[in-house]
Amino acid sequence: FAKADLLRDLVTAFNLTESHAARMAMDPVAVGHLLIDRGIEPIVQMTSRDKNRLAIQASILGAAALGVSNVVFMGGDPPKNGDHPDAKPVFDLFASQLLEAACALNNGTDLTGNALKGTPQLTIGAVANPGASDLETEIDNMKRKADAGAEFFQTQAIYDVGAFDQFMNKAKPERPVLGGIIPIKSVKMAQYMNDKIPGVDIPQALINKIDAAGDDKAKVADISIEIAGSTVRALGDITSGVHIMAIGWEDKIPAILDRASN
């Protein structure tokens, strides 16, 4: 919990992924409960990759019982891309159906209409990809998710603020949007993300800046922090906030936020 304690006075909440990239990790609901015990607000991700509709509803109710009230729903990464490639994917519900399930539980019934004894009080989130190859479909998906109960959105990583601004002007989302930030740790990482992660397009100009630092790790980190900080600053007038996916660089977040404010 050292990283959480380091950042607790700088951020509103901590995002907890559910076996991100299909790599096995502790259940985020359990981690979220432990953070709540430390006075830290969690945002828990839930996917349909590993659970059918019975298990998803049980997890939502379990999260609520443990005090977790912020949940972001998504499909999840296919198991074949993770560290357990033989795991069977479930994907019983689509993303909008996950939201409908959470909304139904919030309103006092399960997906089949059975009444609950008590109701959770969840703030329901969804994801959006402003770099999707088919923006019209992505915008339609955002509207569908909002209609299904999404109260806020988190986006894929943003590197071209101008293109993102155009997306927002076209989408005109009626829910708060948190722009995604992933610091560029290396040229290799940037190239991997451009090749493997749908919707991520790191401009060559940014890659060249990182490349110019050569093998000087401190200089690479400083350039990356400057890029991330300037992106956070630029998003200030476009989004309702940001979510920084530091991927092991959580100790760099204070510097990123400092650059963003200067």
Q: Model regions: which residues?
A:
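Conserved, mostly hydrophobic/aromatic
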Residues: 14, 63, 145, 149, ...
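C-terminal amphipathic alpha-helical "assembly" element
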Residues: 217-262
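Active-site-adjacent beta->alpha loops and helix N-cap segments on the catalytic face
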Residues: 22-34, 52-59, 78-115, 135-137, ...
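A generic, well-ordered mixed alpha/beta core segment in the N-terminal half of proteins
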Residues: 44-48, 52-79
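Catalytic beta/alpha-barrel core
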Residues: 13-24, 46-47, 72-73, 151-159, ...
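Structural motif
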Residues: 9, 66, 148, 237-238
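Active-site pocket-lining/capping segments in soluble small-molecule metabolic enzymes
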Residues: 2, 89-112, 116-117, 127-132, ...
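Conserved N-terminal beta1-alpha1 strand-loop-helix module at the mouth
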Residues: 1-13, 145
